[in-house]
Amino acid sequence: MDLDSLVMMKNSTLTSFSLLALMALPTQAYAQSSSQSEEAFIHSLYAEALDVQQGYQWLDDLSTNVGPRLSGSPGDSMAVLWAVETLDSLGFDRVFTQAVDVRHWQRGEETADFESASGSKVLHVTALGGSVPTPGGNGGEGITAEVIEIVGRDDLHAKGHLLKGKIAFFNEPMDPGLIRTGSAYGRAGWQRWGGASMAAKYGAVAVVVRSLTHRQDDFPHTGAMAYEEKVAKIPAAGISTNDANWLSSELKTAKNGHFHLVLGCKEKKRKTSYNVIAEWTGSSHSDEVVVVGGHLDSWDLGRGTQDDGAGVAHAMHALWLLKQSGYTPHRTHRIVLFANEEFGLDGARAYANEGLEAGRKHVIALESDGGSGAPRGFSVHDVPGAIEAIKPFDKQLARYGCRDWAIGGSGADVGQIDDDGVLLIGYRGDSQRYFDYHHTAQDNMDSVHPRELEMGSASIAALLYLLDKNLVSR
Protein backbone atom coordinates (compact mmCIF):
# COMPACT_ATOMS: atom_id res chain seq x y z
CA MET A 1 0.00 0.00 0.00
CA ASP A 2 1.37 3.44 -0.90
CA LEU A 3 1.56 6.31 1.57
CA ASP A 4 -1.18 8.34 -0.13
CA SER A 5 -3.64 5.49 0.37
CA LEU A 6 -2.61 5.07 3.99
CA VAL A 7 -3.03 8.76 4.69
CA MET A 8 -6.49 8.76 3.09
CA MET A 9 -7.43 5.74 5.20
CA LYS A 10 -6.24 7.45 8.39
CA ASN A 11 -7.48 10.98 7.65
CA SER A 12 -10.15 10.85 10.32
CA THR A 13 -7.53 10.32 13.02
CA LEU A 14 -4.87 12.77 11.96
CA THR A 15 -6.22 15.84 13.69
CA SER A 16 -5.00 15.02 17.19
CA PHE A 17 -1.46 13.81 16.81
CA SER A 18 0.82 13.95 19.81
CA LEU A 19 3.87 13.09 17.72
CA LEU A 20 3.38 16.06 15.42
CA ALA A 21 2.85 18.24 18.46
CA LEU A 22 6.28 17.08 19.54
CA MET A 23 7.95 17.21 16.13
CA ALA A 24 5.93 19.34 13.73
CA LEU A 25 6.98 18.84 10.12
CA PRO A 26 6.90 21.85 7.81
CA THR A 27 5.98 19.86 4.70
CA GLN A 28 6.06 22.81 2.27
CA ALA A 29 9.47 23.84 3.49
CA TYR A 30 10.66 20.27 3.19
CA ALA A 31 9.42 19.99 -0.39
CA GLN A 32 11.37 23.11 -1.29
CA SER A 33 14.50 21.86 0.49
CA SER A 34 14.50 18.44 -1.16
CA SER A 35 17.56 19.46 -3.08
CA GLN A 36 19.99 17.64 -5.29
CA SER A 37 22.56 17.78 -2.49
CA GLU A 38 20.21 15.91 -0.15
CA GLU A 39 19.50 13.32 -2.81
CA ALA A 40 23.22 13.01 -3.48
CA PHE A 41 23.92 12.43 0.21
CA ILE A 42 21.35 9.63 0.37
CA HIS A 43 22.81 8.07 -2.76
CA SER A 44 26.26 8.20 -1.18
CA LEU A 45 25.00 6.14 1.76
CA TYR A 46 23.90 3.36 -0.58
CA ALA A 47 27.09 3.59 -2.62
CA GLU A 48 29.26 3.32 0.49
CA ALA A 49 27.25 0.42 1.90
CA LEU A 50 27.36 -1.56 -1.34
CA ASP A 51 31.02 -0.83 -2.02
CA VAL A 52 32.53 -1.59 1.39
CA GLN A 53 29.90 -4.06 2.70
CA GLN A 54 30.93 -3.43 6.29
CA GLY A 55 27.61 -4.65 7.66
CA TYR A 56 28.03 -7.96 5.87
CA GLN A 57 31.51 -8.32 7.37
CA TRP A 58 30.13 -7.72 10.87
CA LEU A 59 27.33 -10.20 10.29
CA ASP A 60 29.77 -12.83 9.06
CA ASP A 61 31.95 -12.29 12.13
CA LEU A 62 29.00 -12.54 14.51
CA SER A 63 27.52 -15.59 12.79
CA THR A 64 30.75 -17.48 12.18
CA ASN A 65 32.93 -16.63 15.16
CA VAL A 66 30.23 -16.22 17.82
CA GLY A 67 27.42 -18.34 16.41
CA PRO A 68 24.20 -19.27 18.22
CA ARG A 69 23.31 -16.95 21.10
CA LEU A 70 20.48 -18.44 23.14
CA SER A 71 19.84 -16.38 26.26
CA GLY A 72 21.96 -17.50 29.20
CA SER A 73 24.27 -19.62 27.04
CA PRO A 74 28.03 -19.16 26.55
CA GLY A 75 27.26 -17.89 23.05
CA ASP A 76 25.09 -15.16 24.53
CA SER A 77 27.98 -13.98 26.71
CA MET A 78 30.38 -14.10 23.75
CA ALA A 79 27.97 -11.99 21.70
CA VAL A 80 27.87 -9.28 24.36
CA LEU A 81 31.67 -9.11 24.41
CA TRP A 82 31.75 -9.06 20.61
CA ALA A 83 29.24 -6.20 20.45
CA VAL A 84 31.04 -4.11 23.07
CA GLU A 85 34.43 -4.57 21.43
CA THR A 86 33.13 -3.89 17.93
CA LEU A 87 31.15 -0.79 18.88
CA ASP A 88 34.05 0.49 20.99
CA SER A 89 36.22 0.49 17.88
CA LEU A 90 33.86 2.79 15.95
CA GLY A 91 34.41 5.99 17.90
CA PHE A 92 30.94 6.62 19.27
CA ASP A 93 30.71 8.98 22.24
CA ARG A 94 30.08 6.15 24.65
CA VAL A 95 29.43 2.41 24.64
CA PHE A 96 27.87 0.79 27.68
CA THR A 97 25.85 -2.21 28.84
CA GLN A 98 22.67 -2.66 30.83
CA ALA A 99 22.33 -5.81 32.95
CA VAL A 100 19.27 -7.94 32.20
CA ASP A 101 17.99 -11.00 34.08
CA VAL A 102 17.28 -13.66 31.42
CA ARG A 103 15.87 -17.13 31.13
CA HIS A 104 18.27 -20.05 30.61
CA TRP A 105 16.74 -23.09 28.91
CA GLN A 106 18.93 -25.80 27.42
CA ARG A 107 18.25 -28.16 24.54
CA GLY A 108 19.07 -31.85 24.87
CA GLU A 109 18.46 -35.10 23.04
CA GLU A 110 15.56 -34.93 20.57
CA THR A 111 14.38 -37.95 18.59
CA ALA A 112 11.10 -39.19 17.21
CA ASP A 113 9.73 -42.04 15.14
CA PHE A 114 6.34 -43.33 14.07
CA GLU A 115 5.62 -47.03 13.96
CA SER A 116 2.60 -48.80 12.53
CA ALA A 117 1.72 -52.09 10.86
CA SER A 118 3.26 -50.81 7.64
CA GLY A 119 6.64 -50.14 9.25
CA SER A 120 8.47 -47.35 11.05
CA LYS A 121 9.96 -43.99 10.07
CA VAL A 122 12.41 -41.71 11.87
CA LEU A 123 11.06 -38.14 11.97
CA HIS A 124 12.81 -34.77 12.11
CA VAL A 125 11.82 -32.97 15.31
CA THR A 126 13.19 -30.34 17.67
CA ALA A 127 12.08 -29.20 21.10
CA LEU A 128 10.13 -25.96 21.19
CA GLY A 129 11.79 -23.33 23.32
CA GLY A 130 10.69 -23.65 26.93
CA SER A 131 9.38 -27.19 26.63
CA VAL A 132 9.64 -29.60 29.53
CA PRO A 133 11.47 -32.88 28.80
CA THR A 134 9.84 -36.20 28.17
CA PRO A 135 10.04 -38.71 31.05
CA GLY A 136 13.65 -39.52 31.85
CA GLY A 137 15.03 -36.65 29.78
CA ASN A 138 18.25 -37.46 27.93
CA GLY A 139 18.48 -41.21 27.48
CA GLY A 140 15.06 -41.71 29.05
CA GLU A 141 12.13 -43.77 27.90
CA GLY A 142 10.32 -40.80 26.41
CA ILE A 143 6.66 -40.92 25.48
CA THR A 144 4.95 -43.44 23.21
CA ALA A 145 1.34 -42.79 22.32
CA GLU A 146 -1.22 -42.68 19.55
CA VAL A 147 -1.51 -39.47 17.57
CA ILE A 148 -4.53 -37.26 16.90
CA GLU A 149 -4.16 -34.73 14.07
CA ILE A 150 -5.48 -31.21 14.74
CA VAL A 151 -5.99 -28.69 11.92
CA GLY A 152 -7.22 -25.42 13.41
CA ARG A 153 -8.79 -24.29 16.67
CA ASP A 154 -12.24 -25.59 15.80
CA ASP A 155 -10.77 -29.00 15.05
CA LEU A 156 -9.03 -28.99 18.43
CA HIS A 157 -12.29 -28.44 20.27
CA ALA A 158 -14.14 -30.95 18.10
CA LYS A 159 -11.55 -33.66 18.77
CA GLY A 160 -10.72 -32.70 22.34
CA HIS A 161 -12.54 -35.72 23.74
CA LEU A 162 -10.15 -37.98 21.80
CA LEU A 163 -6.93 -36.50 23.20
CA LYS A 164 -6.68 -38.10 26.64
CA GLY A 165 -3.45 -40.09 26.78
CA LYS A 166 -2.63 -39.18 23.16
CA ILE A 167 -0.16 -36.93 21.38
CA ALA A 168 -1.78 -33.92 19.72
CA PHE A 169 -0.35 -33.28 16.25
CA PHE A 170 -1.02 -29.65 15.32
CA ASN A 171 -0.90 -29.44 11.53
CA GLU A 172 -2.35 -26.09 10.47
CA PRO A 173 -0.05 -24.75 7.72
CA MET A 174 0.91 -21.15 7.16
CA ASP A 175 -1.55 -19.66 4.67
CA PRO A 176 0.23 -19.54 1.27
CA GLY A 177 -2.29 -17.04 -0.08
CA LEU A 178 -1.14 -14.22 2.19
CA ILE A 179 1.39 -11.94 0.51
CA ARG A 180 2.93 -10.85 3.81
CA THR A 181 4.56 -13.97 5.17
CA GLY A 182 4.64 -12.45 8.64
CA SER A 183 0.85 -12.37 8.62
CA ALA A 184 0.74 -16.06 7.74
CA TYR A 185 3.23 -16.77 10.52
CA GLY A 186 1.15 -14.82 13.01
CA ARG A 187 -2.08 -16.61 12.12
CA ALA A 188 -0.60 -20.10 12.44
CA GLY A 189 1.62 -19.30 15.43
CA TRP A 190 -1.03 -20.04 18.07
CA GLN A 191 -0.23 -23.76 17.71
CA ARG A 192 3.38 -23.34 18.72
CA TRP A 193 2.87 -20.71 21.40
CA GLY A 194 -0.17 -22.10 23.19
CA GLY A 195 -0.91 -25.51 21.72
CA ALA A 196 0.63 -27.51 24.57
CA SER A 197 -1.60 -26.08 27.28
CA MET A 198 -4.66 -26.15 25.03
CA ALA A 199 -4.12 -29.86 24.35
CA ALA A 200 -3.18 -30.62 27.96
CA LYS A 201 -6.59 -29.39 29.11
CA TYR A 202 -8.05 -32.30 27.16
CA GLY A 203 -5.56 -34.78 28.64
CA ALA A 204 -2.94 -34.94 25.87
CA VAL A 205 0.49 -36.19 26.97
CA ALA A 206 2.58 -34.26 24.41
CA VAL A 207 2.23 -32.07 21.33
CA VAL A 208 3.99 -32.06 17.98
CA VAL A 209 3.61 -28.87 15.95
CA ARG A 210 4.02 -28.35 12.21
CA SER A 211 6.96 -26.03 11.53
CA LEU A 212 6.00 -22.46 10.71
CA THR A 213 7.25 -22.09 7.15
CA HIS A 214 5.91 -22.26 3.60
CA ARG A 215 8.89 -24.35 2.56
CA GLN A 216 8.61 -28.12 2.29
CA ASP A 217 11.81 -29.61 3.73
CA ASP A 218 13.28 -31.76 6.49
CA PHE A 219 14.34 -28.95 8.84
CA PRO A 220 12.21 -28.61 11.99
CA HIS A 221 11.67 -25.11 13.37
CA THR A 222 11.93 -24.20 17.03
CA GLY A 223 10.53 -21.08 18.70
CA ALA A 224 9.12 -20.02 22.02
CA MET A 225 6.13 -21.70 23.61
CA ALA A 226 4.43 -21.01 26.92
CA TYR A 227 2.48 -22.91 29.53
CA GLU A 228 -0.66 -21.65 31.20
CA GLU A 229 -0.65 -21.59 34.96
CA LYS A 230 -2.43 -24.46 36.71
CA VAL A 231 -2.38 -26.56 33.52
CA ALA A 232 -0.23 -29.70 33.23
CA LYS A 233 3.05 -29.04 31.44
CA ILE A 234 3.51 -31.50 28.59
CA PRO A 235 6.46 -31.81 26.16
CA ALA A 236 6.27 -29.84 22.91
CA ALA A 237 8.21 -30.43 19.70
CA GLY A 238 8.30 -28.94 16.22
CA ILE A 239 8.24 -31.30 13.25
CA SER A 240 9.53 -30.61 9.73
CA THR A 241 6.96 -29.83 7.04
CA ASN A 242 7.92 -32.90 4.99
CA ASP A 243 7.40 -35.15 7.99
CA ALA A 244 4.20 -33.35 8.95
CA ASN A 245 2.82 -34.03 5.48
CA TRP A 246 3.92 -37.67 5.66
CA LEU A 247 2.44 -38.17 9.13
CA SER A 248 -0.86 -36.62 8.11
CA SER A 249 -1.11 -38.99 5.16
CA GLU A 250 0.00 -41.99 7.22
CA LEU A 251 -2.59 -41.36 9.93
CA LYS A 252 -5.36 -41.72 7.35
CA THR A 253 -4.45 -45.34 6.68
CA ALA A 254 -2.20 -46.56 9.50
CA LYS A 255 -3.75 -48.87 12.05
CA ASN A 256 -2.56 -48.91 15.66
CA GLY A 257 0.22 -46.43 14.89
CA HIS A 258 2.32 -45.03 17.72
CA PHE A 259 4.54 -41.98 17.94
CA HIS A 260 7.67 -42.21 20.11
CA LEU A 261 9.19 -38.92 21.30
CA VAL A 262 12.30 -38.21 23.39
CA LEU A 263 13.21 -34.68 24.47
CA GLY A 264 16.09 -34.02 26.87
CA CYS A 265 15.67 -30.27 27.26
CA LYS A 266 15.67 -28.65 30.69
CA GLU A 267 15.15 -25.35 32.47
CA LYS A 268 18.20 -23.99 34.28
CA LYS A 269 18.86 -21.17 36.73
CA ARG A 270 18.30 -17.71 35.29
CA LYS A 271 21.40 -15.74 34.30
CA THR A 272 22.52 -12.18 33.70
CA SER A 273 22.89 -10.97 30.15
CA TYR A 274 23.20 -7.43 28.82
CA ASN A 275 21.75 -4.91 26.44
CA VAL A 276 24.62 -3.30 24.54
CA ILE A 277 24.23 0.40 23.75
CA ALA A 278 26.33 2.80 21.68
CA GLU A 279 25.51 6.51 21.85
CA TRP A 280 26.23 9.33 19.38
CA THR A 281 25.43 12.65 21.04
CA GLY A 282 23.22 15.13 19.22
CA SER A 283 24.43 18.64 18.50
CA SER A 284 21.34 20.75 19.18
CA HIS A 285 18.73 18.49 20.81
CA SER A 286 20.78 15.97 22.76
CA ASP A 287 17.90 15.35 25.17
CA GLU A 288 15.87 13.84 22.31
CA VAL A 289 16.92 10.25 21.63
CA VAL A 290 16.62 8.22 18.44
CA VAL A 291 17.03 4.44 18.82
CA VAL A 292 17.93 1.99 16.07
CA GLY A 293 18.13 -1.61 17.19
CA GLY A 294 17.91 -5.34 16.77
CA HIS A 295 18.16 -8.24 19.21
CA LEU A 296 21.52 -9.79 19.97
CA ASP A 297 20.24 -13.18 21.15
CA SER A 298 19.17 -15.99 18.83
CA TRP A 299 17.94 -19.55 18.81
CA ASP A 300 20.45 -22.34 19.06
CA LEU A 301 19.87 -24.54 16.01
CA GLY A 302 21.62 -22.32 13.47
CA ARG A 303 23.99 -19.35 13.63
CA GLY A 304 21.38 -16.67 14.31
CA THR A 305 22.24 -14.95 11.03
CA GLN A 306 18.80 -13.93 9.80
CA ASP A 307 17.18 -13.78 13.23
CA ASP A 308 18.46 -11.40 14.27
CA GLY A 309 22.08 -11.07 13.24
CA ALA A 310 20.87 -9.17 10.20
CA GLY A 311 19.06 -6.69 12.43
CA VAL A 312 22.19 -6.23 14.54
CA ALA A 313 24.20 -5.55 11.38
CA HIS A 314 21.51 -3.17 10.08
CA ALA A 315 21.47 -1.14 13.30
CA MET A 316 25.23 -0.92 13.63
CA HIS A 317 25.90 -0.20 9.98
CA ALA A 318 23.09 2.35 9.54
CA LEU A 319 24.47 4.60 12.25
CA TRP A 320 28.05 3.96 11.21
CA LEU A 321 27.22 5.01 7.64
CA LEU A 322 25.93 8.34 8.93
CA LYS A 323 28.85 8.82 11.29
CA GLN A 324 31.61 8.09 8.81
CA SER A 325 29.92 10.35 6.23
CA GLY A 326 30.61 13.38 8.41
CA TYR A 327 26.95 14.04 9.19
CA THR A 328 26.30 15.84 12.50
CA PRO A 329 23.06 14.65 14.10
CA HIS A 330 20.67 17.09 15.74
CA ARG A 331 19.41 14.46 18.18
CA THR A 332 21.25 11.85 20.18
CA HIS A 333 21.28 8.55 18.30
CA ARG A 334 21.64 5.16 19.94
CA ILE A 335 22.34 1.68 18.70
CA VAL A 336 20.56 -0.68 21.11
CA LEU A 337 21.27 -4.40 20.79
CA PHE A 338 18.59 -5.99 22.94
CA ALA A 339 19.07 -9.05 25.15
CA ASN A 340 16.68 -12.00 25.11
CA GLU A 341 13.99 -11.07 22.63
CA GLU A 342 13.28 -14.71 21.81
CA PHE A 343 12.46 -15.78 25.36
CA GLY A 344 10.38 -12.93 26.70
CA LEU A 345 11.61 -9.47 25.61
CA ASP A 346 13.58 -9.10 28.84
CA GLY A 347 16.13 -6.74 27.31
CA ALA A 348 13.56 -4.48 25.69
CA ARG A 349 11.52 -4.24 28.87
CA ALA A 350 14.59 -3.43 30.94
CA TYR A 351 15.64 -0.75 28.47
CA ALA A 352 12.15 0.76 28.30
CA ASN A 353 11.97 0.92 32.10
CA GLU A 354 15.50 2.05 32.98
CA GLY A 355 17.51 2.67 29.84
CA LEU A 356 17.12 6.42 29.56
CA GLU A 357 18.32 9.03 32.01
CA ALA A 358 15.97 11.58 33.58
CA GLY A 359 15.41 14.65 31.45
CA ARG A 360 15.72 12.77 28.16
CA LYS A 361 12.99 11.43 25.90
CA HIS A 362 12.76 8.93 23.07
CA VAL A 363 11.38 10.53 19.93
CA ILE A 364 12.05 7.80 17.34
CA ALA A 365 12.71 4.06 17.74
CA LEU A 366 13.40 1.90 14.69
CA GLU A 367 13.90 -1.86 14.70
CA SER A 368 15.06 -4.48 12.21
CA ASP A 369 13.94 -8.02 13.04
CA GLY A 370 12.81 -9.50 9.74
CA GLY A 371 15.98 -10.78 8.14
CA SER A 372 18.35 -9.60 5.46
CA GLY A 373 15.92 -9.34 2.55
CA ALA A 374 16.11 -6.47 0.06
CA PRO A 375 14.29 -3.31 1.22
CA ARG A 376 10.57 -3.05 0.61
CA GLY A 377 9.67 -0.23 3.00
CA PHE A 378 8.84 0.50 6.61
CA SER A 379 5.97 -0.07 9.02
CA VAL A 380 4.87 2.62 11.45
CA HIS A 381 3.13 2.08 14.77
CA ASP A 382 -0.58 2.87 14.66
CA VAL A 383 -0.48 6.32 16.23
CA PRO A 384 -2.57 9.12 14.72
CA GLY A 385 -0.40 11.10 12.32
CA ALA A 386 2.57 8.73 12.21
CA ILE A 387 2.23 8.07 8.49
CA GLU A 388 1.88 11.79 7.84
CA ALA A 389 5.18 12.35 9.64
CA ILE A 390 7.13 10.25 7.16
CA LYS A 391 5.05 10.69 4.01
CA PRO A 392 7.28 13.46 2.56
CA PHE A 393 10.19 11.01 2.42
CA ASP A 394 8.38 8.49 0.22
CA LYS A 395 9.81 9.64 -3.10
CA GLN A 396 13.31 9.94 -1.67
CA LEU A 397 13.40 6.25 -0.78
CA ALA A 398 11.17 4.65 -3.43
CA ARG A 399 13.97 4.51 -5.99
CA TYR A 400 15.87 2.23 -3.60
CA GLY A 401 12.99 -0.21 -3.19
CA CYS A 402 11.17 1.30 -0.19
CA ARG A 403 7.64 1.50 -1.59
CA ASP A 404 5.70 -0.51 0.99
CA TRP A 405 4.51 1.60 3.92
CA ALA A 406 2.29 -0.13 6.45
CA ILE A 407 0.54 0.75 9.68
CA GLY A 408 1.43 -1.39 12.70
CA GLY A 409 4.11 -3.97 13.46
CA SER A 410 7.04 -1.72 14.30
CA GLY A 411 8.78 -4.50 16.22
CA ALA A 412 8.54 -6.42 19.49
CA ASP A 413 11.54 -4.75 21.11
CA VAL A 414 10.96 -1.09 20.24
CA GLY A 415 7.28 -1.67 20.89
CA GLN A 416 8.12 -1.72 24.61
CA ILE A 417 9.20 1.94 24.43
CA ASP A 418 6.04 3.85 25.26
CA ASP A 419 7.31 7.42 25.68
CA ASP A 420 4.51 9.84 24.84
CA GLY A 421 4.66 10.70 21.16
CA VAL A 422 7.51 8.36 20.22
CA LEU A 423 7.53 7.37 16.54
CA LEU A 424 7.94 3.56 16.32
CA ILE A 425 9.18 2.20 13.00
CA GLY A 426 9.98 -1.27 11.66
CA TYR A 427 12.21 -2.03 8.69
CA ARG A 428 10.47 -4.22 6.11
CA GLY A 429 12.72 -6.35 3.93
CA ASP A 430 11.52 -8.85 1.37
CA SER A 431 10.13 -11.69 3.46
CA GLN A 432 9.31 -14.42 0.96
CA ARG A 433 12.30 -16.59 1.96
CA TYR A 434 12.69 -15.42 5.56
CA PHE A 435 10.67 -18.22 7.14
CA ASP A 436 12.65 -20.82 5.19
CA TYR A 437 15.49 -20.15 7.65
CA HIS A 438 13.74 -18.68 10.69
CA HIS A 439 14.44 -20.66 13.89
CA THR A 440 16.18 -23.50 12.02
CA ALA A 441 19.61 -25.03 11.50
CA GLN A 442 19.60 -23.28 8.10
CA ASP A 443 19.85 -19.82 9.67
CA ASN A 444 23.43 -19.18 8.59
CA MET A 445 25.48 -17.02 6.23
CA ASP A 446 24.54 -19.12 3.21
CA SER A 447 21.07 -17.58 3.44
CA VAL A 448 22.32 -13.98 3.07
CA HIS A 449 22.98 -12.00 -0.11
CA PRO A 450 25.40 -9.19 0.82
CA ARG A 451 23.81 -6.61 -1.50
CA GLU A 452 20.35 -7.18 -0.05
CA LEU A 453 21.68 -6.80 3.49
CA GLU A 454 23.59 -3.62 2.62
CA MET A 455 20.61 -2.07 0.84
CA GLY A 456 18.71 -2.54 4.09
CA SER A 457 21.40 -0.82 6.15
CA ALA A 458 21.49 2.12 3.75
CA SER A 459 17.69 2.42 3.69
CA ILE A 460 17.59 2.63 7.48
CA ALA A 461 20.43 5.16 7.49
CA ALA A 462 18.63 7.26 4.87
CA LEU A 463 15.37 7.33 6.82
CA LEU A 464 17.16 8.23 10.06
CA TYR A 465 18.94 11.05 8.23
CA LEU A 466 15.72 12.42 6.74
CA LEU A 467 13.89 12.27 10.06
CA ASP A 468 16.70 13.88 12.03
CA LYS A 469 17.34 16.59 9.44
CA ASN A 470 13.79 17.61 8.61
CA LEU A 471 11.61 17.05 11.65
CA VAL A 472 11.41 20.18 13.75
CA SER A 473 12.02 19.71 17.46
CA ARG A 474 9.81 20.73 20.34
Predicted regions and their residues:
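A conserved hydrophobic secondary-structure block that centers on an alpha-helix together
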Residues: 152-162, 166-214
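Bacterial N-terminal signal peptides
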Residues: 16-26
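Active-site-adjacent substrate-binding region
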Residues: 200, 206, 210-211, 229, ...
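Acidic/histidine-rich catalytic neighborhood of metal-dependent amide-processing enzymes
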Residues: 194, 272-275, 298-390
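Soluble metallo-hydrolase cores and metallopeptidase-like ectodomains found primarily
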Residues: 40-41, 116-119, 124-160, 225-305, ...
